């Protein structure tokens, strides 16, 4: 995912935290903030040290989240900034469980424009 699709600055992160709405499941919390006049969505990903004690574990989960979001890119509403925060429960997720849980919470948060997202089991 290109840099233009990322929430980068601390100021932008804090704005989404403070002014946005949150939705959660056991694995992830998603904060959303509608933004008008935006060409495409922007996403921030946070995986704290409580989730994985090593950088390898945290980066692996971030890769899974980014891969899922890249796959869902056509279905994500373009008028949003949103943050995906991993919870400690997501520590041992493989790609399939990450995708399933992330799609679930994105549906709850109304980030996906269509309700008919297919979950492919591999």
Curated annotation (Swiss-Prot):
Per the record's keyword annotation, is RNA-binding included, yes or no? yes
Keywords from UniProt, A to Z, are:
Endonuclease, Hydrolase, Nuclease, RNA-binding, tRNA processing
Q: What InterPro entries does its record include?
A: Ribosomal_Su5_D2-typ_SF (IPR020568), Ribsml_uS5_D2-typ_fold_subgr (IPR014721), RNase_P (IPR000100)
The alphabetized list of GO BP terms reads: tRNA 5'-leader removal
What sort of enzyme, by top EC class, is this?
hydrolase
This enzyme's EC code(s): 3.1.26.5
Output the Gene Ontology terms for molecular function.
Answer: 3'-tRNA processing endoribonuclease activity; ribonuclease P activity; tRNA binding
Catalysed reactions, semicolon-separated: Endonucleolytic cleavage of RNA, removing 5'-extranucleotides from tRNA precursor
GO terms for cellular component: ribonuclease P complex
Which function does this protein serve? RNaseP catalyzes the removal of the 5'-leader sequence from pre-tRNA to produce the mature 5'-terminus. It can also cleave other RNA substrates such as 4.5S RNA. The protein component plays an auxiliary but essential role in vivo by binding to the 5'-leader sequence and broadening the substrate specificity of the ribozyme.
- Tell me which family the UniProt entry assigns to this protein: Belongs to the RnpA family.
Q: How does it assemble?
A: Consists of a catalytic RNA component (M1 or rnpB) and a protein subunit.
HAMAP family per UniProt: RNase_P
Entry protein name: Ribonuclease P protein component
Q: Origin organism of this chain?
A: Lactobacillus johnsonii (strain CNCM I-12250 / La1 / NCC 533)
């Amino acid at each position: 995912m290109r840099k233009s699709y990322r929430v980068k600055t601390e100021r932008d992160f804090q704005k989404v935290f403070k002014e946005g709405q949150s939705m959660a499941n056991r694995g992830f919390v998603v904060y959303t903030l509608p933004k008008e006049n935006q060409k495409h969505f922007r996403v921030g990903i946070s995986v704290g040290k409580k989730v994985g004690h090593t950088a390898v574990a945290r980066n692996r989960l971030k890769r899974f989240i980014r891969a899922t979001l890249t796959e869902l890119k056509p279905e994500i509403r373009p008028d949003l900034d949103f943050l995906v925060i991993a919870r400690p429960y997501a520590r041992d997720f493989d790609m399939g469980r990450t995708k399933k849980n992330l799609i679930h919470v994105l549906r709850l948060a109304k980030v996906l424009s269509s309700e008919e997202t297919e979950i492919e089991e591999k």
